[in-house]
């Protein structure tokens, strides 16, 4: 009789403990979801504020009254038309381009890291950046127009991805290490081709243009090209965003993905292709910009963890904000504009070192 009562009391205690544990887990999830929403709100507000601030900054001074008047109403005087041209033809396309490129490179880096299961994967790992740079340099050396040169950059960026997949097919393997090694081979070849073009280029005219392109800059943007690439960026981001949950399963291995009913080979084609298209389009807009696709995903992981459902949206916002700040500093620090690639490297490398040391200290605890 006593044993029966004792067993019933144990069952009641187990039920109470399980209920409390469930309540604690539910409260923790609610707190995490609330903090995640607050982070998204903060990033969106910061991005909008930085975009508006960038409209005032530049060699041509604009007051708050000028910007508000031009954005809300139609300019009438000749002087106000000049200011409107500065905003709508120069600064606004540049702000949009910096945001798109920052978000695109960051999301592409996070996608590569998930698919290749390598934390050091970046937009350079599959040779897309190097191939796009070669395409642009080839157009410059051949004296082609700006539009044709950027088209060459995009075509060669896609060609590099086809070569990587071709090497993986010849190797008859879709393992991450094989893909990375194939990308390194393709990247090395296109880096060598760029060096050949720099060697053959005219040192008085063509060579400086190639070097300036490789350093990265938004100074030579074409407004129509910026707006024409917006749908491409949005489509690629939409594909990755819709498949963001599958990256969590892919990181566990192909066998786990098959158990969950996924097609790992198809995902390993769709996700890298979408990321590579954004990388090529980014190189088309501003040339070579490093560290963004490597540093920003690591920074966001320190904030929201490894869940790609939260990682991808926050990475896009952080990348856009980061490169927008870098571009604003590039045209505000000195009278002569500093290439964006230089400032992104000077900022990204110390930031990555900080995250690296912080992670090492956390592992030792």
Predicted regions and their residues:
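Alpha-helical transmembrane segments in inner-membrane proteins
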Residues: 4-365
């Amino acid at each position: 009789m006593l044993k029966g009562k004792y067993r019933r009391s144990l069952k009641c205690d187990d039920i109470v403990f399980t209920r409390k544990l469930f309540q604690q887990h539910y409260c923790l999830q609610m707190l995490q979801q609330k903090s995640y929403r607050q982070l998204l709100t903060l990033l969106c507000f910061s991005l909008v504020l930085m975009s508006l601030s960038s409209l005032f900054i530049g060699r041509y001074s604009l007051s708050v009254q000028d910007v508000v008047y031009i954005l809300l109403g139609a300019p009438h005087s000749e002087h106000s038309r000049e200011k409107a041209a500065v905003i709508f033809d120069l600064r606004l396309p540049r702000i949009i381009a910096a945001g798109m490129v920052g978000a695109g490179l960051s999301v592409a880096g996070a996608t590569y890291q998930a698919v290749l299961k390598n934390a050091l994967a970046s937009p350079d790992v599959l040779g897309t950046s190097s191939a796009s740079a070669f395409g642009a340099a080839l157009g410059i050396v051949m004296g082609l127009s700006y539009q044709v040169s950027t088209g060459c950059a995009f075509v060669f960026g896609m060609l590099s991805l086809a070569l990587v997949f071709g090497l993986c097919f010849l190797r008859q393997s879709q393992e991450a290490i094989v893909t990375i090694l194939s990308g390194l081979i393709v990247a090395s070849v296109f880096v060598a081709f760029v060096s050949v073009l720099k060697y053959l280029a005219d040192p008085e005219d063509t060579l400086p243009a190639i070097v300036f392109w490789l350093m990265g800059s938004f100074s030579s943007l074409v407004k129509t090209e910026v707006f024409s690439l917006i749908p491409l960026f949005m489509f690629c981001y939409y594909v990755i965003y819709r498949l963001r949950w599958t990256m969590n399963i892919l990181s566990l291995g192909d066998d786990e993905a098959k158990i969950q009913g996924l097609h790992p080979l198809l995902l390993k084609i769709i996700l890298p292709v979408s990321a590579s298209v954004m990388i090529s389009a980014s190189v088309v807009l501003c040339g070579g910009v490093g560290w963004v696709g490597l540093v920003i995903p690591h920074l966001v992981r320190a904030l929201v963890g490894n869940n790609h459902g939260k990682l991808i949206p926050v990475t896009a916002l952080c990348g856009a904000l980061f490169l927008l700040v870098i571009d604003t500093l590039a045209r505000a620090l000195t009278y002569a504009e500093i290439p964006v690639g230089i400032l992104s490297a000077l900022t990204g490398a110390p930031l990555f070192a900080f995250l690296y040391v912080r992670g090492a200290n956390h592992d030792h605890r």
